[in-house]
Curated annotation (Swiss-Prot):
One of its GO terms (cellular component) is mitochondrial inner membrane. Keywords: CF(0), Hydrogen ion transport, Ion transport, Membrane, Mitochondrion, Mitochondrion inner membrane, Transport. Its main location: mitochondrion. It comes from Spinacia oleracea (Spinach). Mitochondrial membrane ATP synthase (F(1)F(0) ATP synthase or Complex V) produces ATP from ADP in the presence of a proton gradient across the membrane which is generated by electron transport complexes of the respiratory chain. F-type ATPases consist of two structural domains, F(1) - containing the extramembraneous catalytic core and F(0) - containing the membrane proton channel, linked together by a central stalk and a peripheral stalk. During catalysis, ATP synthesis in the catalytic domain of F(1) is coupled via a rotary mechanism of the central stalk subunits to proton translocation. It comes from the Eukaryota. One of its GO terms (biological process) is proton transmembrane transport. It is found in: Mitochondrion; Mitochondrion inner membrane. The keyword Ion transport applies. This is ATP synthase 28 kDa subunit, mitochondrial. Transmembrane segments: none annotated.
């Protein structure tokens, strides 16, 4: 698994961040 994880840490991190922001915004819109 390390060999597959090593090449794409930046992309994965960015994706997770974008996903988190998207979910946060979605939550705000749903509760508003």
């Amino acid at each position: 698994t390390k060999x597959x994880e090593a090449p794409a840490p930046k992309g994965l991190k960015g994706n997770e961040m974008l996903k988190g922001i998207f979910l946060e915004v979605k939550k705000k819109f749903e509760t508003a």
